[in-house]
UniProtKB/Swiss-Prot annotation:
Keywords: FAD, Flavoprotein, Oxidoreductase, Tricarboxylic acid cycle
Broad EC category: oxidoreductase
Pfam families reported for this sequence: Mqo
Keyword Oxidoreductase: yes
An example Gene Ontology molecular-function term: 2-hydroxyglutarate dehydrogenase activity
Pathway it works in: Carbohydrate metabolism; tricarboxylic acid cycle; oxaloacetate from (S)-malate (quinone route): step 1/1
Organism: Escherichia coli O6:H1 (strain CFT073 / ATCC 700928 / UPEC)
NCBIfam families xref list: mal_quin_oxido, PRK05257.1-1, PRK05257.1-4, PRK05257.2-1, PRK05257.2-4, PRK05257.3-2, PRK13339.1
Name of this protein: Probable malate:quinone oxidoreductase
Length: 548
């Protein structure tokens, strides 16, 4: 009995010692000017901006996984599209009178030009190396069938010619021409089927994971930058002097550490919402999140891969979210070409691919539960769509593939689970709550903490999104001559629009193409097309959009 008692006492002392050691460790504060939470492309991009703007600032990056760029930024966990609205039909909605609205498409394209300039600048500085390892020319195509959809694409093509950003786009309704552009899509197709396609040669495939790894590797070369892996944020507390004390747990040895930061960026992808809530800032109460995953069919068969060099986007079917458009894409991953088709929506309560099944429940609070309920009640069609996607069989997915690749063979394809996308739900005075497509920077009034919520267009516009964050949080510094000069060196078109300025558009595309090793030829004459018929559209209830 005495031995048992002694053993229990020893264990208790040992456990207490471990606890005291952890507390002691946590009490040893590390100080940093900027704390970047999350090792993805957003944190990497912001860190790279700040390294040029304020090279003396100290920075610490913490990532819960064993390496950077392993979640949504990983090349296999996203579609790898350089989103510039060249082919994504959801960015050009059709108005009630049949006309096409191009405002969103222009904004998306302008944003991607900023990303191209940012990456080109980093290549010139030696921060990014071997552009072909992370960006490649892959033509972007839209492809539709059926009289109404063909008429839509005619109208879209005509409308986009008003913008200098879309010069060089081709249009065809000829089977032979489209087969030349995308043989895999046309072979085996009914020759009587009414089809149409647009093609833009300057489209890109981007490996955002590789960009992230290279940016962070460059940051690590500086002595005032620290990267802590297998490190999970457990608490955020605002101090009286408006700095933040962030408690970080080492997932390998169980210890904890406090980091005192003047500015905190939460770029943790799906985990950003929960960390924003943990901060306790009032602005966090307006938000909730709803996770949606995506799956793709993948082919690595050389007979398939070598027969397709394009990203081909279709049109969402009636009753489906506009962003859910199927596409069959050439990808360049880990130096190898593959073809992906999808996405197919999946559902999990995880906010991250490597997250917890309790993520959705633990992010639900008394302040955001009502907006979530309103969104659910107001978007029954979206709920039906998600249920139908989850219920898809292997045969269903293969039949969807054959609409874009009529001669597809099952044995050439496997199913791949990509990343999670947490959709933004925001409190709304009129509707109670709304589902918001896109990304949103949420910060406190003092500009000491900011988080990025949302999923689309995401990584392809990391550079303009982080530029927006700088303007929102460091407004006084951004307006200073020093920061203005540096920002214009990083992004030559900063502060002005390219749209409408043909010479400026061509100049920037030529510059970024040369530096990034991309194809670019000055646009030729516009293709002649049948005049689109502007038919009044039936008024249908809009299906809320989501990012997959």
């Amino acid at each position: 009995m005495k031995k048992v008692t002694a053993m229990l006492f020893s264990m208790a002392v040992g456990l207490n010692a471990v606890s005291m050691a952890a507390k002691a460790k946590a009490s040893e504060e590390q100080e940093t000017d900027v704390l970047l939470i999350g090792g993805g492309i957003m944190s990497a991009t912001l860190g790279t901006y700040l390294r040029e703007l304020e090279p003396e600032w100290s920075m610490t990056m913490v990532e819960r996984l064993e390496g950077v760029a392993q979640e949504s930024s990983n090349g296999w966990n996203n579609a790898g599209t350089g989103h510039s609205a060249l082919m994504e039909l959801n960015y050009t909605p059709q108005n009630a009178d049949g006309s096409i609205s191009i405002e969103k498409a222009v904004a998306i394209n302008e944003a991607f030009q900023i990303s191209r300039q940012f990456w080109a600048h980093q290549v010139e500085r030696g921060v990014l190396r071997t552009p072909r390892s992370f960006i490649n020319t892959v033509p972007h195509m839209s492809f539709v069938w059926g009289e109404d959809n063909v008429n839509f694409l005619r109208a879209r093509y005509a409308a986009l010619q008003q913008s200098s950003l879309f010069r060089g786009m081709r249009y065809s309704e000829d089977h032979a021409q489209i087969k030349e552009w995308a043989p895999l899509v046309m072979e085996g197709r009914d020759p009587q089927q009414k089809v149409a396609a647009t093609r833009t040669e300057i489209g890109t495939d981007v490996n955002y994971g590789e960009i992230t790894r290279q940016l962070i590797a460059s940051l690590q070369k500086k002595s005032n930058f620290s990267l802590q892996l297998s490190s999970e944020v457990r608490a955020l507390k605002r101090n009286d002097d408006n700095t933040w004390t962030v408690t970080v747990a080492d997932l390998k040895n169980g210890t904890a550490q406090n980091i005192r930061a003047k500015f905190v960026f939460i770029g943790a992808g799906g985990a950003a919402l929960k960390l924003l809530q943990e901060s306790g800032i009032p602005e966090a109460k307006d938000y909730a999140g709803f996770p949606v995953g995506g799956q793709f069919l993948v082919s690595e068969n050389p007979d398939v891969v070598n027969h397709h060099l394009a990203k081909v986007y279709g049109k969402a079917s009636v009753g489906a979210p506009p962003m859910s458009v199927p596409h069959i894409d050439t990808r360049v991953l880990d130096g190898k070409r593959v073809v992906l088709f999808g996405p197919f929506a999946t559902f999990s309560t995880k906010f991250l691919k490597n997250g917890s099944l309790w993520d959705l429940m633990s992010s639900t609070t008394t302040s955001n539960v009502m907006p979530m309920m309103h969104v659910g009640l107001d978007n029954f069609d979206l709920v039906k769509y998600l249920v139908s996607q989850v219920m898809l069989s292997e045969e269903d997915r293969f039949e969807a593939l054959k609409e874009y690749y009529p001669q597809a063979k099952k044995e050439d394809w496997r199913l791949w689970q990509a990343g999670q996308r947490v959709q933004i739900i925001k409190r709304d005075a009129d509707k109670g709550g709304v589902l918001r497509l896109g990304t949103e920077v949420v910060s406190d009034q003092q500009g000491t903490i900011a988080a990025l919520l949302g999923a689309s267009p995401g990584a392809s516009t990391a550079a303009p999104i982080m530029l927006n964050l700088l303007e929102k949080v460091f407004g006084d510094r951004v307006s200073s001559p020093q920061w203005q000069a540096t920002l214009k060196a990083i992004v030559p078109s900063y502060g002005r629009k390219l749209n409408g300025d043909v010479a400026a558009t061509e100049r920037e595309l030529q510059y970024t193409s040369e530096v990034l090793g991309l194809k670019y030829d000055k646009p030729q004459a516009v293709d002649s097309t049948p005049k689109p018929q502007l038919k009044p559209q039936l008024v249908q209830k809009e299906v809320a959009d989501i990012a997959l």
